[in-house]
Amino acid sequence: MNKYLVPDSGLTSLSAAELAEKIHSREVTSREVTQAHLDRINDVDGTLHAFLHVGVEEALAAADAVDESLDKGEAPASALAGVPLALKDVFVTTDAPTTCASKMLEGYVAPYDATVTKKIREAGIPILGKTNMDEFAMGSSTENSAYGPTLNPWDIERTPGGSGGGTSAALASGEAPLGIGTDTGGSIRQPAALTNTVGVKPTYGTVSRYGLVACASSLDQGGPTARTVLDTALLHEVIAGHDKYDATSVNRAVAPVVAAAREGARGDLKGTKIGVVKQFDREGYQPGVLEQFHKSVEQLTAQGAEIVEVDCPHFDDALAAYYLILPCEVSSNLARFDGMRYGLREGDDGTHSAEEVMSLSRAAGFGPEVKRRIILGTYALSVGYYDAYYLQAQRVRTLIAQDFAVAYDKCDVLVSPTTPTTAFKLGEKVSDPLAMYNFDLCTLPLNLAGLCGMSLPSGLAPDSQLPTGLQIMAPAFQDDRLYKVGAAFEVGQK
């Protein structure tokens, strides 16, 4: 038995929906559930390092408030009231540091809560703490954290993925039943695949980015993670919705994701057309990953789905376009971290000019990958290169969105492997940025188009006995399709 994976029994072994039912029926208290997860964190996180900050008193106080309300006979604040959660350390919180895993923000406590944080609190969900990540969400392994890497509970010599590896590791180890992450090019879906959990990137604009420390504003999207499709849907409904404080927030009804998950749990996919993306089913991927993907497609067929092959030719250019657009936005967004207003300040001894203080602060505060992307973005946006690089990448982005539109004329959802390989060893790709970037091949086209996607467990790869993920992709604002197909697939896996 792997002691770092979810225990076989006890409160930390249960799904969020099961825990909510027990709490709301008063079979157990929210304090008991929250304490059980805090104890689990205490037991295993010294090794896994999924959390950067654990708020014991704050979590228990929130749990006590839920218990007090339920004991008075009041209705639960939400379907998940009382069930604790792990929050990626990129959402600002007034009662805990928000570091984005960077020395630049070490010890920084925000004066306000992110909208997602606020919605979680209003739903009666205790926040266990803030989880580890790649610095400013830049990376695919959680090795770029200034505070050390997170280890994969399935094999502690391997990465849990990134940038949100801390949240996924917390779920996979039973440290938390629910999690919130962000997805810029796969940072929710990719760690979910490597840790055998469920992660969803909602349609861009449907979950508020107010209070989310920006990496690349046109790509970033907060989203839910959990160990089951239903749990993920329940959390999705909590955090989604229009927000007047976010200029990119879309004012439209939230997709009926919970109803879709319950419908999909019947396991019947008759009448559903599922597209297999030709560009994501090819040689070069780990054989065990492709084998599990082909088994997944066979299972979907057995459940009644009609499978069609779709061609998305511009997906081959997605990686290059993404790694031009993202650094350009990073270069702009991270200009605010200058050592003058908040965060790390170096050289503030009266002997340095303001410009020198800024330079010293940024040199000391940012890690190598963040510096690399700032330099790339600044170069691509400079005079003489803007048209040749940035505008060209934006044109490719438009073509990728058109590829998706053509594909969805033929099918309801698309499927692919979530990652080209299973979890890789710690340190294996750190010195080779291109190899690390290639790990996002399957996930980043979705972000460029602003659509929605899910990764869910698709079995262990025969050649490595490590988790693989099936990625499901749906059109904008059709997030419920993810949950219907995902829940059906999940049932078929059992």
Curated annotation (Swiss-Prot):
Listed PROSITE patterns: AMIDASES (PS00571)
Any single biological process term in GO: translation
EC number assigned by the record: 6.3.5.7
Residue ranges of the TM segments: none
Entry GO terms, CC: glutamyl-tRNA(Gln) amidotransferase complex
Active site location: K88, S163, S187
A Gene Ontology molecular function term of the record: glutaminyl-tRNA synthase (glutamine-hydrolyzing) activity
Catalytic reaction annotation: L-glutamyl-tRNA(Gln) + L-glutamine + ATP + H2O = L-glutaminyl-tRNA(Gln) + L-glutamate + ADP + phosphate + H(+)
UniProt xrefs under Pfam families: Amidase
InterPro entries: Amidase, Amidase_CS, Amidase_dom, AS_sf, GatA
Cysteine disulfide partners in this protein: none
Keyword Cytoplasm part of the UniProt annotation: no
Alphabetical keyword list: ATP-binding, Ligase, Nucleotide-binding, Protein biosynthesis
Tagged with keyword Nucleotide-binding: yes
Cited function: Allows the formation of correctly charged Gln-tRNA(Gln) through the transamidation of misacylated Glu-tRNA(Gln) in organisms which lack glutaminyl-tRNA synthetase. The reaction takes place in the presence of glutamine and ATP through an activated gamma-phospho-Glu-tRNA(Gln).
Family under the similarity heading: Belongs to the amidase family. GatA subfamily.
Assembly with partners or alone: Heterotrimer of A, B and C subunits.
Protein name (Swiss-Prot/TrEMBL): Glutamyl-tRNA(Gln) amidotransferase subunit A
Organism of origin: Corynebacterium diphtheriae (strain ATCC 700971 / NCTC 13129 / Biotype gravis)
